[in-house]
Design a protein with these regions (language model features):
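Long, continuous compositionally biased terminal/linker segments
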Residues: 35, 42-82
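Vicinal oxygen chelate
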Residues: 10-14, 71-111, 116
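N-terminal beta-strand motif that seeds the catalytic metal site of vicinal oxygen chelate
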Residues: 1-16, 70, 127-128
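A short acidic/small-residue loop/turn micro-motif
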Residues: 102-103, 126-128
Length: 128
């Protein structure tokens, strides 16, 4: 259903460093990179959704959407724990530590962070 998501940044090198560390743990590849944006996904599989970060096309400062969040499916709670630690050690901030969230369903395990620009991310597993 989703082809790609893009979040704005005010500092592309910082954003690339943050997302490279996370997506390396998720075995995602760099699909595109230039002086304006970068994307990750599965380079040879155009049906796999990609995630972009970059400077806004209109030239204005990148900003965060209120209520906007990108959730990444992860298959093991231990990887979610590691992603949360990696995000925090690379300039991200905590929005909810790793753990079960039974209010969202049996086995729903998640962690929530913000990237250095304030974009909210979730790492989720449905069958922990």
């Amino acid at each position: 259903m989703i082809a790609y998501t893009m979040v704005g940044t005010t500092d592309l090198p910082r954003a690339i460093s943050f997302y490279d560390a996370l997506f390396d743990l998720m075995n995602l590849e760099i699909c595109w990179r230039d002086d304006q944006s970068s994307s990750w996904g599965k380079k040879a599989d155009l049906s796999y959704p990609r995630f972009f970060t970059g400077y806004p096309f209109d030239g204005n400062r990148g900003s965060v959407g209120n209520g906007t969040m990108t959730a990444f499916a992860v298959h093991e709670p231990a990887i979610i724990d590691q992603l949360h630690r990696t995000a925090l050690s690379n300039g991200g901030s905590d929005e909810g530590g790793p753990g079960l969230r039974p209010q969202y369903g049996t086995g729903f395990y998640a962690a929530y962070v913000r990237d250095p620009d304030g974009n909210k991310l979730a790492f989720i597993c449905y069958d922990a």
